[in-house]
Amino acid sequence: MTRPIVADISAAALRHNVAVVREHAPRARIMAAVKANAYGHGVTLCAPVLAEAGVDAFAVASLEEAEALHALGLERPICLLGGPFDADEVSVAAERAYLLVIHEQRQLQWLETRAADAALRLFIKVDTGMHRLGFAPERLPALFAALQRHPRWEVLGLMSHLARSDTPDDPFNRQQAGVFADAIAHVGHVTAGQHSLANSGGVLALPFTHQYWVRPGLMLYGLSPFAGRRGSEIGLQPVLSWRSAVVAIRELGPGDWLGYGAAWQAPARCRVGVVAAGYGDGYPRHLGCGAPVTVAGQTTRTLARVSMDMLFVDLTAVEADIGAPVVLMGAGGPPLESLAAELGTISYEMSCRMQMRVPRRLVS
């Protein structure tokens, strides 16, 4: 018998969320972020659905991710958001016609060494205030003068990243957009005009950041980029439903101890279900003892400590037997955003926690 844990990935929800992007940014092209295995959801399942839904390009974090995506044969441009990490990657990227985001001088030296006469399509990353990656705006004129020595290198546009789009009212968003606009004014005329600034928060709440490309990530998977708000509250549909089942039931008497460390003691007679899911699957260990979980369509809570492969749920008030369905998080269960808040983290991290040993299954 197969271990019952599975991550159901909703094709309908993916299509719906792409439509939400179109609604908010109708004139922009969509570069769908599918890095980190589509934020944990499974790139081999999600990317074909996103392509069918009409996204115009994909964005990944590494050459390895680009190669895995390329193997799917989706005929969409693939953008390496971090550009090449060494000179050897330049040759592969040039052969595959990947879009490269260039953010520092060393990468330009690699291009000169390995692809001086190759046809390349580039974005230039501008540091608009986040101070993570990108060229300072004052360096752009000299940079573009050097780029123009290579007529087969096409600079598609400028790219930058919003640091506080999760708080749309923060004035830093307009400050960054202003720096970006100034950079476009100075060097945009020597690009193809395909600039990009907006991430999910920008798409949903900051229309002044919409350029030729928008780069939604988290929202495609139905998750909210805004603290204190769920995706369902802003018109999105959760793509993930992380499911398992009850594999054993224990009847505890008053004073009986449960789990590792005997960390939980039954205050009265109770019924406990053992679920096939644990921190080895990516379910957070710190969600033991009190986190919401759905069993047989009813909300209950976890008990005691989460083990590597199993966790406990309270079935005292739940009509459920061995084999009863369990939704750990996502559609049909606790919202992932709520569990992330309970842990003091963000939904990005929560969605990326799920391990590869959890099978992903596309459902329509």
Swiss-Prot record:
Pfam families membership: Ala_racemase_C, Ala_racemase_N
Gene Ontology MF terms in the entry: alanine racemase activity; pyridoxal phosphate binding
Record SMART domains: Ala_racemase_C
Active site: 35, 260
Cited SUPFAM superfamilies: Alanine racemase C-terminal domain-like, PLP-binding barrel
Entry keyword annotation includes Isomerase: yes
Residues the record lists as N6-(pyridoxal phosphate)lysine modifications: 35
Binding sites annotated in the UniProt record for substrate: 132, 308
Pathway(s) annotated for this protein in UniProt: Amino-acid biosynthesis; D-alanine biosynthesis; D-alanine from L-alanine: step 1/1
Protein's GO biological process: D-alanine biosynthetic process
Keywords in alphabetical order: Isomerase, Pyridoxal phosphate
Annotated EC: 5.1.1.1
Catalytic activity: L-alanine = D-alanine
Cofactor (UniProt): pyridoxal 5'-phosphate
A Gene Ontology term for the protein's cellular component: cytosol
UniProt function note: Catalyzes the interconversion of L-alanine and D-alanine. May also act on other amino acids.
Similarity comment: family membership: Belongs to the alanine racemase family.
Protein name: Alanine racemase
Species this chain originates from: Acidithiobacillus ferrooxidans (strain ATCC 23270 / DSM 14882 / CIP 104768 / NCIMB 8455)
